[in-house]
């Protein structure tokens, strides 16, 4: 799969269509599932789930990249804001290549729905979806799933696994929760070292809708900054 670009020439990786084994460094789920970092609760610089919401062309995807890299590197937003942009983009692509950041274009994955996101039946077998596979392979350090341009119906991808998104339901917490997936009958958990960063257009995702998920997601508004143009002749 070839890369593409979003916004002001920011490179992204079309990770949805890449063969997982060629990207992710932990093909053995049995080894990854026992790694202690999956239960680590010590990292508190960022929420487990962030939804960046704003009008078109206000830098939502750029903010998502900054957030994802900050999570991986353990740098807060103030530190990330003074990082040279080319360095941030280089690090972002490096983490995509290493399998620490998974970029998902929501319109692409939405066409497959739950089947492509969590799991699907393939004859007598069950095939893992991209979200389930990535979550199961989280081992040392931290991992980020970036979901770009979600819409009002995006939570339908999670179905029964949506309950696992809350911070206090993750692995290693006092209320750690597992759900039994309906197709594979497997017990599925979300590790504490997995973070979700999503973007949405404020016109598409109305306040009444995003308000319904504010217990699970920290909603970060992004607004235009017309003052930047003050005094400029355009």
Model-based region annotation:
Residues 1-5, 10-234:
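AAA+ P-loop NTPase catalytic core and its hallmark functional loops
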């Amino acid at each position: 799969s070839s890369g593409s670009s979003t916004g002001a020439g920011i490179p992204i990786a079309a990770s949805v269509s890449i063969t997982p084994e060629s990207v992710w460094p932990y093909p053995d789920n049995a080894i990854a599932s026992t790694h202690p970092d999956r239960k680590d609760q010590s990292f508190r610089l960022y929420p487990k789930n962030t939804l960046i919401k704003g009008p078109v062309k206000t830098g939502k995807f750029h903010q998502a990249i900054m957030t994802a890299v900050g999570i991986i590197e353990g740098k807060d937003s103030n530190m990330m804001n003074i990082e040279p942009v080319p360095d941030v983009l280089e690090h972002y692509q490096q983490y995509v290549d290493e399998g620490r950041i998974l970029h998902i274009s929501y319109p692409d994955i939405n066409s497959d729905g739950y089947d492509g996101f969590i799991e699907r039946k393939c004859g007598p077998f069950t095939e893992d979806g991209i979200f389930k596979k990535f979550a199961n392979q989280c081992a040392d350090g931290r991992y980020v799933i970036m979901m770009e341009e979600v819409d009002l119906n995006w939570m339908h991808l999670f179905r029964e696994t949506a309950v696992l998104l809350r911070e206090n339901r993750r692995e290693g917490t006092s209320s750690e929760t597992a759900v039994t997936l309906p197709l594979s009958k497997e017990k599925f958990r979300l590790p504490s070292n997995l973070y979700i960063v999503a973007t949405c257009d404020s016109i598409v995702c109305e306040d009444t809708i995003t308000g319904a998920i504010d217990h699970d997601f920290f909603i970060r508004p992004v607004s235009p900054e017309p003052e930047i143009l003050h005094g400029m002749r355009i």
